[in-house]
């Protein structure tokens, strides 16, 4: 060791009294090219002398940041920064003596424990602040749902109103359609029943105007045939023969006496009732194809009269055209 120090002194460097200073003095010798280990004597001596001081420095400097990390974890506030600054100062003075760092670490820790009380108080204050902020947050959260709930309620009420209005409108339409087609249970039946009533009313008006008995019979027959063709769609040929059979019976009924007309009317009513029932049942199948404009107007008329009267009205209206009993037909309407 003495020979090494003498060599370094011969190079113009002061002798090192302490191992830490020896490491500092040996560092320039390494800079001369001995770092690669060519001269192992100087390389082995310098690290051996430098290790204790370096360890002490590491302990002095490393213990302080470790304590700094422990304190912020315990305190949880920004007050640890001044305590860390106070610790750095004694840590810088620690390398002066080997035993001094250990002795100073204890008071540093004690000091850290002492300021830990205000930091703990600050931590409690922060916790109290958080607790005070939590009710504030709760208070802030409570109005937010209160503000949201009325909006939701308003939306719900608005939706309910809109649905109720639409529901009432649909229900009214359904009720009218149901009243018009109680026997069939479809809106198309009411529409066709209204068509039959309209055709029968037009024929009755023509008969009352004083037209010839043959013309009104042909007119309602054609109208009924057209209505049944449009309603049945696929059974126009079957409807025509029935109407043709009913039409020839009407002229003799108008020529014969009332006594003879009564049984013929009963038979005609039965036949026409069957035809009208078929005509009312057919539109129930072909109801979806009926245009809405034609359904709307008859639906209002069908709301006042049930399906049975709607189907029976055309038969009663078609008969008075040939017979002189027009007032009872009007009364039936």
UniProtKB/Swiss-Prot annotation:
The Gene Ontology biological process annotation of the record reads:
actin crosslink formation; actin filament bundle assembly; actin filament organization; apoptotic process; central nervous system development; mitochondrion organization; neural tube development; neurogenesis
Q: Which PROSITE patterns match?
A: MARCKS_1, MARCKS_2
Q: Where in the cell is it found?
A: Cell membrane; Cytoplasm; Cytoplasm, Cytoskeleton
- Chief location category: membrane
Q: Which Pfam families match?
A: MARCKS (PF02063)
Name of the protein described by the UniProt record:
Myristoylated alanine-rich C-kinase substrate
Highest taxon in the source lineage: Eukaryota
* Quaternary structure (record): Interacts with CDC42. Interacts with GTP-bound form of RAB10. Interacts with calmodulin/CALM1.
Q: Which residues carry this modification: Phosphothreonine?
A: 15, 142, 149
- Which positions does the record annotate as the modified residue N6-acetyllysine? 171
Q: Where is this region: Disordered?
A: 1-333
> Has UniProt tagged this entry with the keyword Phosphoprotein?
yes
Q: What family is this?
A: Belongs to the MARCKS family.
Q: Which organism is it from?
A: Bos taurus (Bovine)
In the record, Phosphoserine modifications are located at 26-27, 29, 46, 63, 77, 81, 100, 117, 127, 134, 144, 146, 158, 162, 166, 169, 264, 315
One Gene Ontology MF term: identical protein binding
Record's compositionally biased regions (Basic residues): 151-163
A single GO cellular-component term from the record reads: cytosol
- Where is this chain lipid-modified, annotation N-myristoyl glycine? 2
Q: Which InterPro entries match?
A: MARCKS
Bias (Polar residues): 26-35
Keyword set, alphabetical order: Acetylation, Actin-binding, Calmodulin-binding, Cell membrane, Cytoplasm, Cytoskeleton, Lipoprotein, Membrane, Myristate, Phosphoprotein
**Region Calmodulin-binding (PSD): what ranges?**
151-175
* Bias (Low complexity) ranges: 73-84, 91-101, 109-135, 199-229, 292-333
Topological type in the membrane: Lipid-anchor
- Tell me if Cytoplasm is a UniProt keyword of this record: yes
């Amino acid at each position: 060791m003495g020979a090494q120090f003498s060599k370094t002194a011969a190079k113009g460097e002061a002798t090192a009294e302490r191992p830490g200073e020896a490491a500092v003095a040996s560092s320039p010798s390494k800079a001369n090219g001995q770092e690669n280990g060519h001269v192992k004597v100087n390389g082995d001596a310098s690290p051996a002398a430098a290790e204790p001081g370096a360890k002490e420095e590491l302990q002095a400097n490393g213990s302080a940041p470790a304590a700094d990390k422990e304190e912020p974890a315990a305190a949880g506030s920004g007050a640890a920064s001044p305590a860390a600054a106070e610790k750095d100062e004694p840590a810088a003075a620690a390398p002066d003596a080997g035993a001094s760092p250990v002795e100073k670490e204890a008071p540093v820790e004690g000091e850290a424990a002492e300021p830990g009380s205000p930091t703990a108080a600050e931590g409690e204050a922060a916790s109290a602040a958080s607790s005070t902020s939590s009710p504030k947050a709760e208070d802030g959260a409570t109005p937010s749902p209160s503000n949201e709930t009325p909006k939701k309620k308003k939306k719900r009420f608005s939706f309910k109103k809109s649905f109720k209005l639409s529901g009432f409108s649909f229900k009214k339409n359904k009720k009218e359609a149901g009243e018009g087609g109680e026997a069939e249970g479809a809106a198309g039946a009411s529409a066709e029943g209204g068509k039959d009533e309209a055709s029968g009313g037009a024929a009755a008006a023509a008969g009352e105007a004083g037209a010839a008995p043959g013309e009104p019979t042909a007119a309602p027959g054609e109208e009924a045939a057209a209505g049944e063709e449009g309603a049945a769609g696929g059974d126009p040929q079957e409807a025509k023969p029935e109407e043709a059979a009913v039409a020839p019976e009407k002229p003799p009924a108008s020529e014969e006496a009332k006594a003879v007309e009564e049984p013929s009317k009963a038979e005609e009513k039965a036949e026409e009732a069957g035809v009208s029932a078929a005509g009312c049942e057919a539109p129930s199948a072909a109801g979806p194809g009926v245009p809405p404009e034609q359904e709307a107007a008859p639906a209002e008329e069908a709301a006042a009269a049930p399906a049975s009267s709607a189907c029976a009205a055309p038969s009663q209206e078609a008969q008075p055209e040939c017979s002189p009993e027009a007032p009872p037909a009007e009364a039936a309407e």
